[in-house]
């Protein structure tokens, strides 16, 4: 059986920009992407902690060290600059792969700097 499991999470990032006139997507600082192994053009699910919106888009790599989290195109209507978001990817794994799978989680501070990396296992609580 194949199951869809969380693969990576950027936890509590702050939206730094919103660009309605760009052709869709989310731009994320390349350093953050590398830390959690998210690739450009990869599909992501986004949860806005401020308003409860949940949506999907794809990733564009942003400038390294910028802390940039910019929602582009239609998705920009679902956020405000300063909103706290969770950005996740999923992977389809078989039962054997699941036994050895540990999602990468980057916990962010208010400036979108990684303050903790968690290789998530069962029952991990991230506040």
Swiss-Prot record:
InterPro entries linked: Asp_de-COase-like_dom_sf, Asp_decarbox
Pyruvic acid (Ser) modifications at: 25
This protein's UniProt keywords: Autocatalytic cleavage, Cytoplasm, Decarboxylase, Lyase, Pantothenate biosynthesis, Pyruvate, Schiff base, Zymogen
Gene Ontology BP terms: alanine biosynthetic process; pantothenate biosynthetic process
Compartments in which it is found: Cytoplasm
Posttranslational modification: Is synthesized initially as an inactive proenzyme, which is activated by self-cleavage at a specific serine bond to produce a beta-subunit with a hydroxyl group at its C-terminus and an alpha-subunit with a pyruvoyl group at its N-terminus.
Superkingdom assignment: Bacteria
Any one of the GO CC terms: cytosol
Reactions this protein catalyses: L-aspartate + H(+) = beta-alanine + CO2
Pfam family, one: Asp_decarbox
Active site, per annotation: 25 (schiff-base intermediate with substrate), 58 (proton donor)
Keyword Chloroplast: no
Textual note on the cofactor: Binds 1 pyruvoyl group covalently per subunit.
Family: Belongs to the PanD family.
Subunit structure: Heterooctamer of four alpha and four beta subunits.
The name this protein goes by in its record: Aspartate 1-decarboxylase
Organism: Staphylococcus aureus (strain bovine RF122 / ET3-1)
Gene name per UniProt: panD
């Amino acid at each position: 059986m194949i199951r869809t499991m969380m693969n990576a999470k950027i936890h509590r990032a702050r939206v730094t920009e919103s660009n309605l006139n760009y052709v869709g997507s989310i731009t994320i600082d390349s350093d953050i992407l590398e830390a959690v192994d998210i690739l450009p053009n990869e599909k992501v699910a986004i949860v806005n902690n401020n308003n409860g919106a949940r949506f999907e888009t794809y990733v564009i790599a942003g400038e390294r060290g910028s802390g940039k989290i910019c929602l582009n195109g239609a998705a920009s209507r679902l956020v405000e600059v300063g909103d706290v978001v969770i950005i996740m990817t999923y992977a389809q794994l078989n039962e054997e792969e699941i036994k050895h799978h540990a999602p990468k989680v980057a916990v962010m501070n208010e400036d979108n700097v990684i303050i903790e990396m968690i290789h998530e296992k069962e029952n991990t609580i991230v506040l």
